[in-house]
Amino acid sequence: MFNHHKVEIEWGGRPLILETGKIARQADGAVLATYGETVVLATVVSAKEPKPGIDFFPLTVNYQEKTFAAGKIPGGYFKREGRPSEKETLVSRLIDRPIRPLFVEGYKNDTQVIITVLQHDLENDPDILSMVAASAALTLSGVPFMGPVGAARVGYVGGEYILNPHLDEMAETKLDLVVAGTSDAVLMVESEAHELPEDVMLGAVMFGHRNFQPVIDAIIKLAEVAAKEPREFLPEDLSALEAEMLKVVEADLRDAYKITNKQARYDAVNAAKAKVKEAFLPEGAEAYKWTPEQVATVFKALQAKIVRWNILDTGSRIDGRDLRSVRPIVAEVGVLPRTHGSAVFTRGETQALVVATLGTGEDEQYVDSLTGTVKETFMLHYNFPPYSVGETGRMGSPGRREIGHGKLAWRAVHPLLPAPEQFPYTIRVVSEITESNGSSSMATVCGTSLALMDAGVPLAKPVAGIAMGLIKEDDRFAVLSDILGDEDHLGDMDFKVAGTAEGVTSLQMDIKITGITEEIMKVALEQAKDGRLHILGEMANALSESRGELGEFAPRIEVMHIPTDKIRDVIGTGGKVIREIVEKTGAKINIEDDGTVKIASSNGKEIEAARKWIHSIVAEPEVGEIYEGTVVKTADFGAFVNFFGPRDGLVHISQLAPERVQKTTDVVKEGDKVFVKLMGFDERGKVRLSMKVVDQETGKEIVQEKKEEKQEAEG
């Protein structure tokens, strides 16, 4: 019944198993992949005919985590998986990026890749396994895919690279780098690092590339026995159309790409496009020699060629810069004075308005995942409204691109943030892209660094980011610093590098062609470092280090520690005590399981009142100390006084006043505020208090009484 095939290798100290022919047999390609005890299913389905009326490749990648994979039931009313989580979105992008450039150019059949996590051993992250499984499923499917692709995660501990570190090892590593590619080329890199030098980052990329070669060999071995017949697909030969179109618009496009202003350049390009449409798709014609899709495809290819020729032949770019120059930069801080921290970072025609907000433990984000619930104290949200590129468009929840760009900036800044013990605030940063012409994610990095420092967050060092590009033809290549949007679309490689003056904190690389050597990547990284240092210098003109104190409108947080066995006393039955403290002092209070108490308010008096209240609950009163209390009950033999948090004590009638007292209520009534001295404890541990040794006006001890006590003791 089943035509089952299986390949198994040892990889990174664990077995990697690829199977096909038993599950999801109606898909074009399906692979069940196991690494350790983590299991994923990858499937590929591609339409038999191209999607009409489009000039792009309609590829969709969906990565999904099923909660049953970790033995859990989803939360919420419906108890089933809902919209994709942030991680699912990010892993979908991670899988998409290395496979997309490997489809044969011109293939436009609707294609969907679905990867489902079926089992998680809580040691091996499913993301790398999912990339491998997707590559294997595509290789078996028969679609025109020039793979297979391998992938690996690289850690860095004690000066040594680690292949596919376990989840518990990730806490120790100074690097979390994912690399993917073919047998002879790196295609994609995604990473977070703790200020590592460029040579260590490049070494990690090459280490990963070498170590995923056995995976590629295993996929090929499986394909040799299980792959479907390749689909017949011949890319269209549009060279004749290209030659004709060059005659019509080459001069117009060359002139258009000499215009430095983005909108004016787009107007000129659109005029050239209209000229092409008139020449090849005239209105009223009964039939066309070329289809609208073919004309659009060739026009787009011509744009790329003309830009690339200009750069390689003249060393001059679209906006007139040379290869290494960074666009003019203006950095400003404190632009929204009532917010906790703000900055506007402008680089050429790209601009980010970034605002930092400080919150308390109540504002932490709880993220449910297969490995458990994680508390996030740093959030970075990137928004790309359509007006930033002079267009109308959809508004609403963030798309995959916005989530991905936000996470890239998050990775760049995260290693420089203070530990929660040093800075017990929840931080949310929002980056609004108000203008865009390339490199908006790196503008977000720069703006975030400035906004955090403006808010008084003790960032270890300023962070900057730069987007780089590469154009390669045969043996000639050009590395471009601070690329424009057009250079991003028309180039062969774009990579984004963020970090401090000392090292790299984030590296993202996407390579669209083969033949990018280690030497070319080294040149590109060194050029990116020069650009990053220049940007840091420009940022320093606005703010070079964190302000010494928090903004006027930011909350203040004081941290205190209480014994864990006292947590119950502070919270009270059903939360009664802590609610009363919050209501009466106005401060926000967060208590953690280890006894850490965070008290927050924009008013210092509220914090102090809450701190004293909590201290009075958990501390023990000291013999000989004077306390202010409230009479809570009177009796024939004395008065009970609440003097230390919830603790009451008896002032015997003989201790109410220096003179003889006939009746307790002659001296005090319920509700009176009094000063008492803790004299000690009786044999049953009951508190003994005295009022007569304390001046009830000043709260000071009566010295004469002390002398008499001393004389009595000596006598």
Swiss-Prot record:
Cofactors, names only: Mg(2+)
Cellular component terms (Gene Ontology): cytosol
Binding positions (Mg(2+)): D488, D494
Transmembrane domains' residue ranges: none
UniProt KW keywords: Cytoplasm, Magnesium, Metal-binding, Nucleotidyltransferase, RNA-binding, Transferase
Pfam families in the record: KH_1, PNPase, RNase_PH, RNase_PH_C, S1
Ranges where the KH domain occurs: 555-614
GO biological process: mRNA catabolic process; RNA processing
Span of domain S1 motif: 624-692
Gene3D superfamilies cross-referenced by the UniProt entry: GHMP Kinase, N-terminal domain, K Homology domain, type 1, Nucleic acid-binding proteins
Subcellular location, record wording: Cytoplasm
Its EC number(s): 2.7.7.8
CDD domains: KH-I_PNPase, RNase_PH_PNPase_1, RNase_PH_PNPase_2, S1_PNPase
Catalytic activity, as annotated: RNA(n+1) + phosphate = RNA(n) + a ribonucleoside 5'-diphosphate
InterPro entries: ExoRNase_PH_dom1, ExoRNase_PH_dom2, ExoRNase_PH_dom2_sf, KH_dom, KH_dom_type_1, KH_dom_type_1_sf, NA-bd_OB-fold, PNPase
GO MF, one example: magnesium ion binding
Protein family per UniProt: Belongs to the polyribonucleotide nucleotidyltransferase family.
Function: Involved in mRNA degradation. Catalyzes the phosphorolysis of single-stranded polyribonucleotides processively in the 3'- to 5'-direction.
HAMAP family noted in UniProt: PNPase
Protein name: Polyribonucleotide nucleotidyltransferase
